[in-house]
Amino acid sequence: MTESAIDDQRFNLTKELQRHSCRDQGKITQKDDALDFISYSSFQSSFNTDQKSANNGSTVRRSIRSIFRRAAELPRVHMGPLTYSHGINELVNKKLRKDCDLSTLCRVLQRGIRMIRMTRRRRKFYEFKLINNNGQIIWKDGSKYLELDSVKDIRIGDTASTYQEEVDPKRLRSDSKLWIAIIYKVSNKLKALHVVALNELDFNTFLSCICGLVKLRRELMESILLPDNSQFARIHWQITVSEKEEDEKKDTLSFADVKKLCDKFHIYVSTGQLLEFFQLADINHNGLLNYFEFEKFIKILKNRKEVNMIWSKFTKPPHSHLSFENFFQFLITEQHEQVDRQTAWSYFIKYREPTQLTMGQDGFTKFLKEQPYLVEVKEELYSKPLNHYFIASSHNTYLLGKQIAETPSVEGYIQVLQQGCRCVEIDIWDGENGPVVCHGFLTSAIPLKTVIRVIKKYAFITSPYPLIISLEINCNKDNQKLASLIMREVLAEQLYFVGTRTDKLPSPRELKHKILLKSKKTSEATRGLSVNEPFPSSFSSSYESANEQELRMKDDSTNSSSATNSSSMQRIKRIGLKKHADIINDVSNISGIHGIKFRNFSLPESKTIAHCFSLNERKVEYMIKDKHLKLSLDKHNRRYLMRVYPHVLRYKSSNFNPIPFWKAGVQMVATNWQTNDIGQQLNLAMFQILDHQPDGSFKSGYVLKPKKLLPVVTKAKMIPLIYEHFENGSDPVTVKIRILSTQLLPRLNDTSPSRNNTNSFVKVEFHTDDEPTMPISIDKGTRISATEASTKSSQGNGFNPIWDAEVSITLKDTDLTFIKFMVISEETQIASVCLKLNYLRMGYRHIPLFNMEGEQYIFCTLFIHTQIL
């Protein structure tokens, strides 16, 4: 029995079960029919094939055309999301109702489920409905809606409790188990829809339906856009024309049909080039494509000339297949893989022709697509003291936007921890009912306990290595006691104290699944060692200038009627905070790292093993410019910890260039993760390296410093000798990168300047700590500066544009060198990626591309070839 026949029988059985379960609803309507593809997809993935049962099924065939054709009539609607979200893997695995299929659940939600929408101001009943044609959930009579493709995560149970306390502190206990928080994005801003179901059945139905649809729409994009040519053609034909094999010869597609189909599935080719492909496939020359001609059209469309060139290099005529010996040679000479023959054979077997001992071009292309592009790190590299590592660090973690008047949110902590951040910041202030977390600039606040619970939940979701919490204590002694009690109770055995250890800091491997608090020492502990300091050393020095602004705001607000409610008054109280916040023993005793006020590097407090200086970017930049201070800074950071954070004038949460601070050996270079500018892209690239962990964890958040930054010295004057030694032992490095092509390039939106323009080029930027020994050059493009160049424009093809341009640059070394690729059309950036150069594997690699918000496109990649000579 053929696979397609089995699929048909699977569907028939599914359809029969579905009809049986819905008998009381009468005849299945066209709206029901529109959901058949949902039932088929979900059932196909879970059904164990039973041919005997299948043969007894009905002869009803599935019809998925209706949903796609109705969707095709909506010009702004595509078939699924373009990008992945950081929490998508956890999201799509949520499934509570197993007693019925997704199609049945969706029918219920189409009719509407009555629930309570929760906001900080009110609780109100609404009927929530699914509009299946364009993937929306609507309420408030359709005036409010949520796009399923914009959903980033769904929180229930413990993960939703933090939102419950934030939105409705006086909620009923019975609400907690029925609360659903949907995190989604609108205009690049995260929002949350909080709903409470009226009963467990509605809760399970709504949750299972939303999670199932989000998962299905993502899989739809993956399965339709990425299969082999024949499968690709069949899926698109069935969606657009007919599912019946007997119709393949008589049904046809016009050029207008093909153009609409391409647009719907993010296939952007100029009208002229698309017409050329259409005419090449139109063997009958009748202006229409039957199925076999359409299959040829897909083959022409997806033909990759750049891969053909690689293929012909290793398969000399008359051979049309790749032998194992040639494949092994390709791995060693082109890919620079350090593999033995046994490992190479395992790759070869996976991608070879099913019945032969050779590899075809389709298998070879698939191999190229699926090969990793980043190097891996072994766990033994995490055995050195903490001060030997760069640590992924966040500034103002609780903010999702600019600093002034921005509402704090636990979502900030969830997002950075999902991305591998290992040092988060908590600003603790006095609240009406205990310690709260906020920025202090007339913002609302989150209960500290809520934040600590979220951190505990997500602390090790991505990385098993230690998490550092940088505490900014701005509250009175009573709230400090409460804060220490909260952290002891919630974090419990995960808290780590350095104690009396004086020789060296523990390693990341020793501290797996541990949490270290960083706070200022008590005034008693620092008395006699330093002058009185009104704020914790880790407290942002920006407060001094900001406090003056806040006091003026306080004076202006005293007579304002807008500050009459208790929440606003509490914000004013925080502004009038006294200029002194002594740290009590309760907080200091549970801290593993102690922040101290920086005066100079020679005092006794600068030599305690667990101390940490916390300085703003300008103070460190000043040190770097001074010859003697620069050496002292370098010497300190070889043995002790330091944290650098953005200056107060970055009120829009922009980021600095982190490279000079890494070059100075600073471990915790804290950036605003909520802003995806070049500073944050460099920061993410530094910690993008994958870990070879048994549990599959990745993005450890710890990167071993370059070797020249590791040797501990007793005298600062020894440091130049270290650098001289490493420079003498290494030659300049020439980097050659051939930019070949991109695949499935997306279009920004319908109103973008490149709406009807499929011409694009790639801009390349090298970001490094030193001037290049030899500036950048490019063979098919334009040099912009010593470190920047751009390719020529690829005309007419936005689906798989080819550039085949090589850039070359010579550098002193690659320890702190990053490369950024940007795909640009009509001066509009479509996609980009930033990589640390020495993480990049050699040879041919497909690099995933990201949108302007830093989210990875599901199907868009950049194909390059890299050599380091």
From Swiss-Prot:
Highest taxon in the source lineage: Eukaryota
Report the residue ranges that make up the PI-PLC Y-box domain in this protein.
590-709
Q: Where does this protein hold substrate? A: K518, K520, S614, R643
Every C2 domain range: 713-862
Which stretches of sequence are listed as region Disordered? 546-571
What residues does Ca(2+) bind to? Answer: D282, N284, N286, E293
Q: Name one GO biological process term.
A: signal transduction involved in filamentous growth
Q: Name one Pfam family in it.
A: PI-PLC-X
Q: Where is the composition biased (Low complexity)?
A: 558-568
Which Cys pairs does UniProt list as disulfide-bonded?
A: none
**Which keywords are on file for this protein?**
Calcium, Hydrolase, Lipid degradation, Lipid metabolism, Metal-binding, Transducer
Give the EF-hand domain ranges. 269-304
**Which SUPFAM superfamilies does the record match to this protein?**
C2 domain (Calcium/lipid-binding domain, CaLB) (SSF49562), EF-hand (SSF47473), PH domain-like (SSF50729), PLC-like phosphodiesterases (SSF51695)
One of the entry's Gene Ontology molecular-function terms is: calcium ion binding
Q: What is its EC number?
A: 3.1.4.11
Q: What's a single GO CC term here? A: chromosome, centromeric region
Q: What does the annotation say about its assembly with partners?
A: Interacts with SGD1.
Q: What is this protein called?
A: 1-phosphatidylinositol 4,5-bisphosphate phosphodiesterase 1
Q: Which organism is it from?
A: Saccharomyces cerevisiae (strain ATCC 204508 / S288c)
Lineage of the species this protein comes from:
Eukaryota, Fungi, Dikarya, Ascomycota, Saccharomycotina
Gene it is expressed from = PLC1
